[in-house]
């Protein structure tokens, strides 16, 4: 094939050789990359696992410990002080001939947006479970996020050195709570010294780590004939049987062989890899990151079972050799300015290259860096499939798609549409990049608001600049200006989120801002349908502006805006230009952002346009303002009810403390869903409670339980309120409570 190509006409031999060499290099380079995320519930040991990977790969010379505050990936002051991950961080390290790009993500629910954006950059994930707790609340959240991105995954059961660890329960949790098909390729055991060892199901070996050299080396021992070996052989046979039902190649061998013992390890691994990449199974491994057990085999599994970049993201093949890169994070460096983390999906990014983001802005890459958390090594170019940090991008935001030019983007869009059979080659239409490539920019609703004030008037500009930079890093941070009070208002995902923002502004920007009291982000919904006509006529700068709109608000959880299709109104609406309808829609929907009672977003409400008469020469801005004014009038007429945010809590405490905790919860308007046994001495309470009643609840729970209880909390939607609670909420918002 190569000989034929070199002697075919139409292209100089040297140029063809260069192109073939570049293509072959890219393919082999890409096949040796693994882009992975590491996900977990808070305190499952995710960051410790990452630090061990860096140490054993030779990337770091000492073990980073969360409790010592010397980790590579948790480099923010707030992360090291609190012992939690707040921002996603990217690290690159070599392992057995491959290059692993790993994204360490937060485990706390307040920073779930960090996880969501990081998953756009990876091809597979490792989900870390606490061996003493199994699948927890945030485990379910991150698993659902991985499902959304269709990511192959491995499960790593950590803390298996602990006496209360339960491997079988963790595996059962994966099967029942996450509705997946776990495949155990390791089982825990103990050596004669009582230390954790691992039995490998595929090789039938016992793996023992050496504590004297910090787990750098481990021995493999073939199990002697015994009950342990017989049980492990049964597990191996079960694994082969399970995989043969999912993989045709393995099934053919099983059918033709006389015994499962004749099925080679390599054949099992290949079948398991195919099943994992197709998301049919989840391989389960185990270890203890803190005790330095099992990490090397976890990295081996990343290489063996998770996909290379070229096996994923085929939708971007439409770019050919042009650049396609997904922006998944932005950080601000004091010396280098904004640094943009990009997953290169196709093509090659070089230093000095000009790029276009999917929103149309032109950018120039001044420098490129290889990621290692907050340390950077400059490089000249980075190939498809890799992760890179770009300096010099000024307008790009998280979620943008970067490409070589607008022409390259348009051509890729059209090729993709043609491959889907939805557009002809010569059709010229405006295409939605986000919709076409499945880019979701949806930002979760804030659950808390508070005002933010600089220490002095002279610090106002610096504070606004700091907020702009933090908002570019963290899309879930909302910043707005309240025209009524004249205050800057922050919206965030929780108390911890807001506290971290204040702390970062002080530590990174040296501005000691003052945050006002936290306000609950209530929503509003209409009590009853209402219809009205608003006619406005004014003369502005000598031009007559004339608008008459008939609008209605109705209860509806679907579209925000619709047209009345009744015969008497349809003829009028058909005369309106699409642009005019869009202007009316934009003005109408904007009025739903601020309800009449507490300024909350109006939800479960649809605006219906019945009639519109617009005078010649009337400006779009005037039409938009009239539509907003009409909807505001309707909301006041119909009246609104308040909806309050509800949180789902999981509380684990000793059995003797449960009654006191439940009594306190009942005073907080909580709905107790279930009380389940949790081990021999503990119970777990599953409860929903209004966020307004949970201010400072962590401290209260510690007091009630004498420090023996633990809690996780995450948003669980909104719920209506009775008249008394509504009145209290209004007084709180007005600052009267």
Curated annotation (Swiss-Prot):
Transit peptide: 1-29
Keyword annotations of the record: GTP-binding, Mitochondrion, Nucleotide-binding, Protein biosynthesis, Transit peptide
Xref: Gene3D superfamilies: 3.30.230.10, 3.30.70.240, Elongation Factor G (Translational Gtpase), domain 3, P-loop containing nucleotide triphosphate hydrolases, Translation factors
Domain tr-type G span(s) in chain numbering: 31-310
Gene Ontology MF, one: GTPase activity
A GO CC annotation given for this chain: mitochondrion
Compartments where located: Mitochondrion
UniProt xrefs under CDD domains: EFG_III (cd16262), EFG_mtEFG_C (cd03713)
Pfam families noted in UniProt: EF-G_D2 (PF22042), EFG_C (PF00679), EFG_III (PF14492), GTP_EFTU (PF00009)
Principal subcellular localisation of the protein: mitochondrion
Keyword Transmembrane (UniProt): no
PROSITE patterns named among the record's database cross-references: G_TR_1 (PS00301), G_TR_2 (PS51722)
Function: Mitochondrial GTPase that mediates the disassembly of ribosomes from messenger RNA at the termination of mitochondrial protein biosynthesis. Not involved in the GTP-dependent ribosomal translocation step during translation elongation.
Family: Belongs to the TRAFAC class translation factor GTPase superfamily. Classic translation factor GTPase family. EF-G/EF-2 subfamily.
Protein name in UniProt: Ribosome-releasing factor 2, mitochondrial
Organism: Drosophila pseudoobscura pseudoobscura
Gene designation per UniProt: mRRF2
